[in-house]
Swiss-Prot record:
One of its GO terms (biological process) is mycothiol biosynthetic process. Homodimer. This is D-inositol 3-phosphate glycosyltransferase. Keywords: Glycosyltransferase, Magnesium, Metal-binding, Transferase. Its EC number is 2.4.1.250. It comes from Parafrankia sp. (strain EAN1pec). It comes from the Bacteria. The lineage of its organism: Bacteria, Bacillati, Actinomycetota, Actinomycetes, Frankiales. Mg(2+) binds at Y324, R325, A327, T351.
Length: 434
């Protein structure tokens, strides 16, 4: 820095690294273009596509590499100015389970490297990998291109294995080892919450100084408050219905069965409530094309609540916002969540959330202000929290107001700026190379 009218300093400041102008974003196992709530598509899909769009809006071009699941997909598709999704042929042109994908890592990596070879030298400034499979690809790509690797885990095997639900399979040891390798070698790590940061440092030995906490965002233009009665009519419900809503993939980890059991408990306590209550599950089974998960259909029958339970296939975000606005409460009883995007989307619509007190849900939901956090998975405890919301209008309005205020701080612009800061730290000469 030079002072006007004076001599230059004896020891000039080092030049600042140039901003990241192009980023290779890796999302091997799930395309950001897939409908969340189907197969393995979920909050990470929303994260990748919204982050890419916002980064481009701030001046950073993004190329997202994802596995091609159909021969009809174009090799490259520009989905927004500055955002290209590249469909990489690796394995069969169909959805396959995540447990089968490690066999196709080499093929995916080779095609990513081949694509970059068609660009000018030094095309990408940063590699940003999402989930451990992409992290393995990112290690190779970053080393080949001589650029830093920034990694976002989204979920961690050791955390999931410590909180398995009944019927869940533990994550395999190769995943644990793969995550360990990525966390050690990555230039920067992005965690969604302070809790995830602690998991990275305490369970995987990540250097605290290279972990950046950047909360995911929510589209506050799409997910916004509205008239609940009008929203209920729009989704085909009576305006006076008290709606309990679950949104997400149907799998033991997400515990939708807890909501069904809690609803049955509410009716047991007050049989007259049956005519007012509705339970809607918006989502599809993980890794299956079934429209309705058989296990939940059977559970509803066993609990005697088939008449009040409705299964809704996954819907686009604009339609999902109507469901959130229609709900009296959104229930998120997951056994593990690195953040809990559904909880924030619901709160942005002014809907109170009843969630498990685990992981990132402790950050997403302000207990007693925007919703209620429940310890454990006893249906009666969820019924207690829901009963108060259903019966005490003043309490429900208090939580609704708090929900809107809570969600207001989770915009995608803030997320993108935080991620850009992590990129800059990775590019800095002081950063540790991959």
């Amino acid at each position: 820095m030079h002072l006007v009218g004076g001599a230059p300093p004896e020891h000039p400041e080092p030049a600042r690294p140039k901003p990241a102008s192009r980023v290779a974003m890796l999302s091997m196992h799930t395309s950001p273009l897939e409908q969340p709530g189907t197969g393995d598509a979920g909050g990470m899909n929303v994260y990748v596509i919204e982050l890419a769009r916002q980064l481009a809006a701030l001046g950073t071009e993004v190329e997202v590499f994802t596995r091609a699941v159909s021969s009809r997909l174009p090799p490259a598709l520009e989905i927004a100015p500055g955002v290209i999704v590249r469909h990489v042929p690796a394995g069969p042109f169909e959805d396959i389970g995540r447990e089968e994908l490690p066999a196709w890592l080499c093929a995916f990596t080779a095609d990513v490297l081949r694509t970059e070879a068609g660009h000018a030298a030094g095309w990408f400034d940063v590699v940003h990998s999402h989930y451990w499979l992409s992290g393995q690809v990112g290690l190779s790509a970053a080393r080949r291109w001589g650029v830093p690797l920034v990694h976002t885990a989204h979920t961690l095997a050791r955390v999931k294995n410590a909180s398995l639900a009944d019927g869940d399979r533990p994550e395999p040891e190769p995943r644990v080892q793969g995550e360990q390798e990525i966390i050690k070698a990555a230039t920067r790590l992005i965690a969604s919450t302070d809790t995830e940061r602690r998991h990275l440092t305490q369970l995987y030995g990540a250097a605290p100084g290279k972990v950046d906490v950047v909360a995911p965002g929510v589209d506050l233009d799409v997910f916004r408050p509205g008239d609940p009665r009008a929203a209920r009519k729009r989704v085909g419900l009576d305006p006076d219905t008290q709606l309990l809503l679950f949104v997400g993939r149907i799998q033991p980890l997400k515990a939708p069965d807890v909501l069904l059991a809690a609803a049955a408990e509410l009716i047991h306590r007050d049989p007259d409530r049956r005519g007012q209550l509705a339970v809607v599950v918006v989502g599809g089974p993980s890794g299956s094309g079934l429209e309705r998960p058989d296990s939940l259909v059977k559970l509803a029958a066993e609990l005697g609540i088939t008449d009040i339970v409705r299964f809704q296939p996954p819907v686009p975000q604009e339609q999902l916002a109507h469901w959130y606005r229609a709900a009296t409460a959104v229930v998120v009883p997951s056994h593990s969540e690195s953040f809990g995007l559904v909880a924030v989307e619901a709160q942005a619509c002014g809907t109170p959330v009843v969630a498990a007190s685990v992981g990132g849900l402790r950050t997403a939901v302000a207990h007693g202000t925007s919703g209620v956090l429940v310890h454990g998975w006893e249906p009666a405890d969820y019924a207690d929290a829901l009963e108060r919301i259903l019966t005490e209008e003043r309490w429900r309005r208090h939580l609704s107001t708090g929900a809107r205020l809570r969600a207001a701080s989770f915009g995608w612009t803030a997320t993108a700026k935080g991620v850009l800061a992590s990129y800059q730290a990775a590019i800095s000469p002081a950063a540790v190379a991959v």
